[in-house]
């Protein structure tokens, strides 16, 4: 595993997924796409590492390529019900992008998509949850 910081730590390479064991919190939601993360065993390993860290884990699966507003809204609603301390996106750009939008709606349920699209229009995050991709 390798690590560099800019201003956050980035873990990559062999063994990087194991860093999930060091996360602190009570609940984590993992957002994934079509199934490759499950097929190749990464999803099960991520869940196991988070549980080893003492967290309850919930999955939001099936994020489609070029995620729809409806998918983002369903994910945000799931987050509002589950109240995760960590939002973890796994897979390609679509699950990561969708999870980031869900995170904003989770932290600020009344924010509109128009407000979210304004340059520098998003209020400060990490008040309810941290994000990991």
Give residue spans per PLM region.
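ATP/NTP phosphate-donor binding region
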Residues: 1-86
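Glycine/threonine-rich beta-strand-loop-alpha-helix active-site module
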Residues: 70-133
């Amino acid at each position: 595993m390798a690590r560099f910081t800019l201003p956050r730590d980035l873990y990559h390479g062999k063994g990087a997924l194991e860093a999930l064991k060091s996360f602190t919190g009570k609940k984590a939601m993992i957002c994934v796409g079509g199934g490759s993360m499950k097929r190749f065993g990464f999803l099960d390993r991520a869940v196991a590492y988070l549980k080893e860290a003492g967290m309850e884990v919930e999955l939001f699966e099936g994020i489609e390529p070029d995620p729809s507003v409806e998918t983002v809204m369903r994910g945000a609603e799931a987050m509002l019900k589950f109240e995760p301390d960590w939002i973890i996106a796994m897979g390609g750009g679509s699950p990561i992008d969708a999870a980031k939008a869900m995170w904003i709606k989770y932290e600020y349920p009344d924010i509109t998509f128009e407000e979210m699209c304004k340059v520098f229009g998003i209020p400060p995050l990490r008040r309810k949850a941290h994000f990991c991709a």
